[in-house]
Amino acid sequence: MKITFEIYYHTRWGESLMLSGETEQLGSGDESRAVVMDCRGGDLWSYTIEVPATIAAFEYRYLVKSGDSVRREWNRPHRFVPGQKATEYRLLDRWRDTPDDLPFYSSAFTQGIFFRQHPQPQPGVPAAGTVTFKIFAPQLRPDEQLLLVGSVPALGNWEPSQASALDDTDFPEWHLTLDAAQLGPSFEYKFVVVRTQQREVVAWETGANRVYTDSEPSSSTAVVVSGLLFNGPERPWKGAGTAIPVFSLRTDYGFGTGEFLDLKYLVDWALRTRQSFIQLLPVNDTTLTGSWCDSYPYNANSTFALHPQYLRLSEVGRLSDEARQAQFDALQRELNMQPDVDYERVNRAKMEYLNLLFDEQGDDTLSSEGFKQFFRENKFWLQPYAAFSSLRDRFKTANFTRWGEFASYDESMIADYCAVWSPWYRSVALYYYIQYHLHLQLSEVRDYAHRAGVVLKGDIPIGISRTSVDAWVNPDLFRMNCQAGAPPDDFSIEGQNWGFPTYDWEVMARDGYAWWKARLRHMSRYFDAYRIDHILGFFRIWEIPLDAVHGLLGHFHSAMPLSPDELAQKGFRFDASWQTVPYVREESLHDIFGAYTDEVKTRFLVDKGNGRWDLNVMMDTQRKVVDYFSGADDEMNVLIRDGLLKLLDEVLFLEDPDQPGYYHPRIMGNRTQAYQALDDEQKACFDRLYEDFFYWRHNDFWKAEALRKLPVLVASTDMLVCGEDLGMIPGCVPEVMKQLQILSLEIQRMPKEWNCEFGDVSRYPVRSVCTTSTHDMSGIRGWWQEDPARTQRYFNEVLGESGQAPATCEPWICERMVELTLSAPSMLAILPLQDWLSIDGRLRRKNPDEERINIPACPHYYWRYRMHLSLEQLLAEGVFNTRLQEMIARSGR
């Protein structure tokens, strides 16, 4: 059987067009063995291979090579599917660049919003003597169809009512196979969008007619025209959605926390109110200490495992001991009545129940075909996770450095530990059992959402816990001697220290970022969109030394620190002896320590003379200070502790840990005592180099860093990619996000324009997600009460109201703010549930402070917010739901 590949491509001098495919004749998928195509003139390239008649379907790609440089197509490959009775195939392809409407190719649209039911799939199979047309048209709505109309009777003579409809089985690619003899050797054609039922024309393709010509038609040849893109008028789509953590959901079936199956009620409500997205916080297992500290969803013990608290126990099974079951039922009712999540009691009860249930039915579950398939597909992460969980329980700590012979992960040792003959097997298999049921329940929700045309949007944390399975199994992928965080911002004046180790991107790059790809592909089993938490981390991360506590002592990594010579060239008189160590002056001590000043001097400081002091060896790092005062929470000790931490922040430059002798200006260095000690000329010089360092110097450098990583990761799944790009944003970030078509995040109270207090919603980019607030902020009602002067300006300048602003955010004001956000050009408007409810004075919570999910400035915050009304109640609120539906519809969403 003969297959001829043909493609038009205009090459430059020295370039060659290559063909790489899964067959032996095309290099078996190895790019280094790709074949060189023949140039037949006029930019037409071709290549013919002989293959067995029994060949199976295969994928292939085109490449352009010039020396060592390679230009590749978009990540979606071409696919050859053998047909019927054809002895020769002509594949007339088009080069595939990344489409301009990339978000519509994501599974958020193909499997969710524009999901098309296919009770009996009919994949396109070419046959001898036919021409098959394949075209990408991802923006067609579920009630629309694509027709092929043309200049010959077989194509309806330009009459849509007589034209043939394309098949959407492989949506967003459409296909149609026609008899070549009826088409003739040459004709013109276009594609037309119509309503499926009425055949009412929605849109014709724009531009000149397409032309097909075959000078040598053959009854034994199957021709496939592929790679076409629908060239229609722009049809903007805007959607709305709700953001809420799973643990915050409340239903009548709950066990004191939200569960995966509760999301089906939220899907129903989204459908009822014209919403298409449900955005969640991370749902991975965070069990490390067994305390409420594990409520923090961004500190997972595994980037793959799901959290056991999200299981609906009644769907897993009921205990055979009726008295014991009755005790759990009573506890469930008690916990479900609580206003907030009691994390410790809920998780303790659920794990106790699951242990009992596992004893009763675990063997049957683990011997089922469904579980065996799940285990085969997930063993690479499931077995290490289950072993980690067993060892954590056994040693009473997640700090694997305290696990004796298991402190360093050894694959063969863990295989023995998990073997069925191991005395620890049952403790390991318990976690197999739990993860399998979590998989079943979340998969059920995903399928339910797909059928409803609703998208589940997940969240990818930027960091991993330093006491996690990932750090235990793959320590070489992380910089374990560092901590990730964020520089100071509106949320935290001392910056944020998340405690996570940072990524060693150089090591990760060696295997093509395999760990990241596996993580994202696993996530795509349950979600069709995701939010990259702190997308700036892919450009650079705020890295803090392990012996520091405050984010103020961090620096960017990767970065280009300054040498003393470069500082001198910029006119700055650098002196490491006092500019890189805490600069403590006598006159500041009393302001900080008050009546305890003399005691602090005696116990913790060293007099250097000339009014300067050093911290003694007991207190020369922030980690030592925190450890020393651990457990001391009286007023005096807290004041002294915080004062000493403040003194340690008083440095003007920080030495780079990887490049000794090179330095970073300390963030907000102009607020230090060392800066105040400079003369005016040196202050001005520092200000100039500071601005250049933080806002200009690294733009191209960080852009290159991001483009090494993000394209590979974005292309690894079909999920819609959104980025959290708030905070200190270098100019390269929006540029790269636009290039990769990653949706940005827009919030009116956090504008990205300089010298602007409130964002202009009408100027938000189309490729963005807009919202009123996030889980790290107060809701719009809480924000309204935080700063009366700012609120007054918003009331007058943004809302255009005159007079005094109300002291509280009244429902009509909330409605105005919600409508303003909905009016933005942003593709998505995803609001917290609390802000949707704020427009109704009867339904919203009385105290807006009780709606807070997280306070970033508090490093040990208890994440326990729950809805104050149940989802069943919300679904029954017909008047409110209709009002919300109409509000969203009026906004064009």
What does each model-found stretch correspond to?
Residues 91-101:
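Boundary detector for helix-to-coil junctions that initiate low-complexity/charged tails
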Residues 6, 20, 38, 63, ...:
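Residues in well-ordered beta-strands of folded domains
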Residues 14, 57, 143, 186, ...:
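Short secondary-structure junction motifs
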Residues 10-55, 65-85, 137-185, 194-217, ...:
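Aromatic-rich carbohydrate-binding modules that target alpha-glucans
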Residues 101-132, 179, 211-893:
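Catalytic cores of glycan-processing enzymes that make or break glycosidic bonds
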Residues 2-7, 129-136:
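A short, amphipathic beta-strand motif
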